[in-house]
């Protein structure tokens, strides 16, 4: 062989091979599904390229994949006449993993084999799965349109290096030969191989054929028998398709090893004609938050594959949705640029977005447990929706889930409809608080009066929550109100103040003025409040002022943060406030006021500019 060289696998491939062989062995038959799935993709790509260059078919447009085995040599071969690969493509596809962040992710994986096997599936391991059952894999391939002498040979035992060389290959496409390990003889059994193909590959449009050998007149006659239905699943009638087939098709297009949570298969006729098959995965991909993460739907036009990851059909906050769309209204030569500016695309995107939101609403209604699985995996992504998609804001809001004071649990299980159904008589607003953690939200002094009145408060502690609530202004005609902001509706909830209390408050007016004079412009205002029961003081912000959590978001993003001017609210019934008001010594008075302000700021922000000064002051006052 000419041009032979031995090369080392990229380190991530070595790690993946090791993990895969050990984690996926209990489900080893999936290697055949993966290799046939790759062959199907190769056929799709050839069909697409041949639209503009029919010569790529080289006189053979009947695309298929053929499976054969040799019991004497203990080999199993999967051969397709798809698009094939040149030498550079072989090295790129079979020697490296092109996903950024792969190395650190693989290093973080532990010894939980069940979990590992699910996560490994997300790499679209395809080809490498051959090493689960083979101790050596040989590949012979030639790219469509290349000369026969530009064929490529690739071989590896999957241990750290591979050999690549130039060969002559008359027919285009890829032929993968697995040299089976000892003990894997089941994959040399005709019936066993047929049953695996039927189980996993009925849904793909590419014919899968198995070799038949018959003795006729003393000679061995070879023929090929089609095993699968070879009809694209989404073109079939829904009533004819079993759940298992939908599940297997999902695994084929998503390169996932787990079943989806739910799906929606629809054929639309009329102004626009298209078929969509949309899936909600049961597990988030490991790189969901990676900027390079590819997402979007497979796009077909009149059943011809056009592209993977067509992100123009789904808003970013639904980037976890997998599936395909087959349109009759787009041109076969459509490009990503054309899709970007197409009215057809915009209309399809709008319809598919509504379809997904309806699918999620149905899942939430029919199976709360499954919806909780969805929420744990993708809730943070869905929370981007209110800012991104004003037109569907109400539908998105129905799908949101929160922790709340009603459940006494950090689990985000409360819907806005649940909250509204429990609102007290006369309650006009939906109350919420944002904080760095569930514990900080739950124990915030801002909740004291509302707890006393039995009014539910939503406890928001994800980083995105404050940003989301800037866009989510109302639900079911009821405004959202942060309990950390000054608001008349909260003060109104306080019990009617009796005449004696009013007199006592009037007597405290000089104290309030004294505090204002001391603090100056460090606070926006000083006032007495009846929204506290156990806490001496809190700080709040005006409705139009930037909140504490929003300021933290700005700071985390490296942006300049305007100074937040707080309202300092004092509880006139608290013993510490009364003691401070009775303190005549100015130095001692200053220490008490500073302590109360620091306590309030610490409860609100979780940090202080000078924590050592706070500790010193507190210790000093404790012993005074």
Swiss-Prot record:
Lineage, uppermost ranks: Bacteria, Pseudomonadati, Pseudomonadota, Gammaproteobacteria, Enterobacterales
Location of this chain's protein in the cell: Cytoplasm
Molecular function GO labels: ATP binding; ATP hydrolysis activity; ATP-dependent protein folding chaperone; unfolded protein binding
Protein name as annotated: Chaperone protein HtpG
Superkingdom, taxonomy of origin: Bacteria
Signal peptide: none
Recorded GO CC terms: cytoplasm
Organism: Salmonella paratyphi A (strain ATCC 9150 / SARB42)
Region (C): 553-624
Record's keyword terms, sorted: ATP-binding, Chaperone, Cytoplasm, Nucleotide-binding, Stress response
Main function: Molecular chaperone. Has ATPase activity.
Keyword Cytoplasm appears in the UniProt entry: yes
Pfam family membership, one: HATPase_c_3
PROSITE patterns in alphabetical order: HSP90
SUPFAM superfamilies: ATPase domain of HSP90 chaperone/DNA topoisomerase II/histidine kinase, HSP90 C-terminal domain, Ribosomal protein S5 domain 2-like
InterPro entries from the UniProt entry: HATPase_C_sf, Heat_shock_protein_90_CS, HSP90_C, Hsp90_fam, Hsp90_N, Ribosomal_Su5_D2-typ_SF
Main location class: cytoplasm
Stretches assigned to coiled coil: none
Subunit structure: Homodimer.
